[in-house]
Amino acid sequence: MNAEALETLHQRLTLALQALPEESRRVFHGRGRCWEGLEHLTADWLQGVLLVSLFRDPGAAPLQALREVLETLTRSPQWPVDARLLLQHRYLPDSHTEALRGEVPEEWLISENGLRYKLDLGRKQNNGLFLDMRYGRRWVQEQAQGKRVLNLFAYTCGFSVAAIAGGAARVVNLDMARAALSRGRDNHRLNGHDLGGVEFLGHELFKSWGKVKRSGPYDLVIIDPPSFQKGSFALSRDYQKILRRLPELLAEAGVVLACVNDPDVGPGFLIEEMAREAPELAFSERLENPPEFPDIHPDSSLKALVFKRR
């Protein structure tokens, strides 16, 4: 991260500050490798917080230079009054977040597609909502009317919130992280949703197929796993186990949204494995990613693929 890269960052963020979005958005996506020297840095506008995240230790001198560049932004006429500036060190075991302006809030409320979500800033590696899945949540909201939805690896239930907002008849959320599911309940309550049609299962998926199947069949199944979760999920080893179960979980005209966010795994992985493990399902389309997530290699970015029962 040399002086030229930092100047590029300063220019890009200055432009972003001149036209900040009303909702939360990524405003700089270095991980798409479109800007040399900034491949390990992102910046998100979270409606009153500019969160800059570093995914690799740049070294002491470049880090201090980065701090100085960011702090100059807060003195510019474009800087919003009372906005906070946070720098998250994602490469550290505790993903430490330092406040360069203002304080690190314990909780923070944002909106996306007209829906509200609660974030954790400064306490965890991930803050509670993956912004690159914005179009995926919008698609679910558009498809959900009257549907029975299964949301696997639900995390904080962003897909569930979108589905209920779109008129889903019922949503079953499954994730082994009960604290994340609890935040999912909070997100539903933030949006005034009746939780009578929402189920939260804090179980390990591969030990819970019976319970999942009994709550079906489902009109829409969403699969959005981590690339690797120590002790419970490895994408290359375990995704196939889910795909082969889909025919018994889906309703007659069932639809699947299958996702992968590993830069080393292209969309062909899901298409080929689905054809092998669940040939009853045909590939329909790959959802577009938001434009604020440019990638020099599009197949390295988020893959959200739609499959439909033949």
Which residues does each PLM region occupy?
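Conserved SAM-binding loop of SAM-dependent methyltransferases across substrates and taxa
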Residues: 156-168
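Conserved class I S-adenosyl-L-methionine
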Residues: 146-155
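Non-catalytic accessory regions of SAM-dependent methyltransferases
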Residues: 1-47
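S-adenosylmethionine
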Residues: 205-279, 287
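Non-catalytic substrate-recognition/targeting regions of SAM-dependent transferases
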Residues: 36-37, 42-44, 65-130, 138
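Class I S-adenosyl-L-methionine
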Residues: 270-310
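Conserved SAM-binding motif I beta-strand of class I
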Residues: 170-175
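S-adenosyl-L-methionine
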Residues: 176-222
